[in-house]
């Protein structure tokens, strides 16, 4: 089977991956309230972009389609970390959001304490999934190293800290870029780089640049989508800092740079990652 389009890839892989992830938590988490709270946010309608990017890179690096299920543990770990971050991000002490993806935020559904524990459970269960993976020790160690680096205090957590402690300060463009890189882009970069390592593909600067570019582009797209609803009026966003038109130009430049970077990648099927860029045209 040869798949050239990212959307087609997700259509074929996502149902099986979702079933795998649900079954893992259903069977491994015995405390019912904790399990319900974890699954509530995990199954809240996310697109699974990060694990799908991980699997797409593995597939593009030569992993056969029928063997992709061997990589579900690592893909699942990436999604668990992402979901934990959303639960904690919505807490009253953070962004204080009552809704996520059209549903009550976890803390509004279960309470603040259970929501914190649900996030804690997802984060720690992620590394259990990696440890139990059937992949070789060196690949599992690479996944732990990259994911903990990019999602922890040297990456995503640092970005979140900057976000909540600098709310009353207008950040410079460089500071805002660093914030978005850490808070949003680093986990996307992790998904792509772990995908390459897991498939035995030698990581290049071109693939890293692609990952960094689309990671920042993700945040710009979200900022633009939210620019008209008024909710981000007092937040550090690129539309607020440089204007909507210049943000759109910056987004277009990032997508162009990402395309040029992945086209330089050698010994790698570029089709899925090139077609993924259509996401930013929606």
Residue ranges and their predicted role:
Residues 1-282:
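All-alpha prenyltransferase/terpene-synthase fold signal
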């Amino acid at each position: 089977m040869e798949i050239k389009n990212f959307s087609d890839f997700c259509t074929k892989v996502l149902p099986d991956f979702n079933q795998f992830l649900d079954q893992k938590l259903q069977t491994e988490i015995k405390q019912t309230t904790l399990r319900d709270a974890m699954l509530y946010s995990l199954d809240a309608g996310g697109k699974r972009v990060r694990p799908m990017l991980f699997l797409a890179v593995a597939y593009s690096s030569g992993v056969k389609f029928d063997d992709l299920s061997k990589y579900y543990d690592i893909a699942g770990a990436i999604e668990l970390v992402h979901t934990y971050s959303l639960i904690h991000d919505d807490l009253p002490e953070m962004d204080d959001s009552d809704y996520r993806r059209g549903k009550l935020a976890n803390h509004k559904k279960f309470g603040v304490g259970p929501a914190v524990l649900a996030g804690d459970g997802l984060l720690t269960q992620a590394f259990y999934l990696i440890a139990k993976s059937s992949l070789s020790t060196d690949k599992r160690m690479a996944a732990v190293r990259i994911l903990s680096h990019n999602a922890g205090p040297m990456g995503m957590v640092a970005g979140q800290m900057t976000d909540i402690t600098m709310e009353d300060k207008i950040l410079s463009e460089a500071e805002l870029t660093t914030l978005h890189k850490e808070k949003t882009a680093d986990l996307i970069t992790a998904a792509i780089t772990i995908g390459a390592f897991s498939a035995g593909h030698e990581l290049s600067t071109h693939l890293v640049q692609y990952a960094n570019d689309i990671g920042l582009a993700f945040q710009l797209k979200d900022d633009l989508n939210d620019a008209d609803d008024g909710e981000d009026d007092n937040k550090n966003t690129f539309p607020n800092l440089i204007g909507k038109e210049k943000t759109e130009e910056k987004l277009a430049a990032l997508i162009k740079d990402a395309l040029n970077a992945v086209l330089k990648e050698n010994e790698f099927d570029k089709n899925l990652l090139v077609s993924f860029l259509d996401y930013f045209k929606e």
